[in-house]
Structures are given as structure tokens and as C-alpha cells.
Amino acid sequence: MTDFKPFFDSLDRAMAEEWDAIVKVNPFFNSLMDGLDDRRLLGVYLPEVYNTVKHSPITQALVVQRLVNPSTTSLRYMAYCLRHALEEVGHEQMALNDLRSLGVDISNERMPPPTIATEAFTAYVYRLATTGNPYQRLGYTYWAENCYAYFAPIAMAIVQNMKLEAKNLTFFVQHGEIDKKHGEEVRKIIAEVATTQADRDAIMAALRGTIRLQGAMLAEVHRTYELFIKGQAPQYDFAKILGPSL
């Protein structure tokens, strides 16, 4: 039986490497670390979280359309995908509720369209779910369920800089608690289904790809925020109520 600890260790190292590369140059992260206290940044960021996360249950469920040859392994993986998809339903509403907790008058129907970087990220995850190795989406899942340790400094900076409370960032706080359980589950299913080196290579490539594209998404959020405060991104006018913390 394959010992998966070395593989999980390599995934963890890859996450750290990719995230460190993002942190060094990403304006979204660096502006917060430098003390940016303008809540309008959240007015741009949280809609992108919403626009990303609402696709998670769909892309997770789409994987099963490719598991057409029943086997013990494929049936276990199918059950995992469908169960996990169901558990992800509605998580984007946390981002919506966080905006509302800040006093923003927003609804599902009024959410702005995604930025091009968010669209690219989402399209990549759809490709992972519908083409190539059927297990590769687990690379994205592994990152998504273990990324909150990396996002913790961002959440802490947002709370401190913008003088917020935990109730204003439920997506980070509550979602992070939920994903502790999911992190254990994704390790278990990887150990059950990733039986070949090709499977593990596909999972690793997907993990690295999703982190890099998420970094691009964060950079685009910051660029869009800068346009917004100059009056050049009217799709975010609902967030005008937000401003530098008092």
C-alpha cells in the first residue's frame, strides 16, 4: 500500500512555495500589510469571492459525469464528489452576508459580474472538472480546504486595519472552521483514488495552477479597487457607502 505522507508533504510544500511567490509581489496582499484601511477594497473583493465560490458545488459535481465505468474506486470518488458538492452549496452567501453586515445594500441579483481574472480562474476549475485526469480537481480541493492558514494574515489585517468584527468576515471565520473537516476528507479520498504517479502529478499541477490563478485574481481585485476609487468602475457603486475606517 502506498504511503501518501510524502505526497501530502509535497503538496504542502508546493502551497507554501506558490503562496510565498504571490506574497512577494501581489498588491492586494501588500497594501493590506502596509495598513490599507479602506473598506471599499472589501466592496470589490467580496463580490469576487461570491463569484468564485458559487461555482464550487457545480464543478465538484461535474466530475462524476466522467466516472462512467463502475469500480470500487470510482464509486467511492463519485460519492465523495456528490457529498462534497452538496456541502458546498450556498457558501457564497457568506460573502453576500458579510457585505450586508458592513451596511451595503446588495442582493444576489445585484452582484456585479466577475473580473476577467476571476473568470479565468473559474474557467480553469471547470476545465479541471470536465477534461483530463478525473482526479485532478482534487488539487484545487486540497488548496481550497487548506488555504485558510495562508489567508489568515489577510483576514487579520482586514479586521485590524478596517476596525471590523468577526461577524463582518464570516466567510473567513466560519468557512475556515468548516474546511478543517473537509481538509481531512480530501486527504482520505486522495489516498484512496490517486493510485498512479500520473494521478498524483495531475493533482499537483492543478494545485499549483489554481494558486497562481488565485493570485492573479487578487491582483485584479486591487487594480479594480484603484479604478473604483477613481470613479472608473461604476459596477461597484453599491460600495460607495464604504470608506476609510474612522
Set out the residue ranges of the language-model regions.
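Non-heme di-metal
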Residues: 1-246
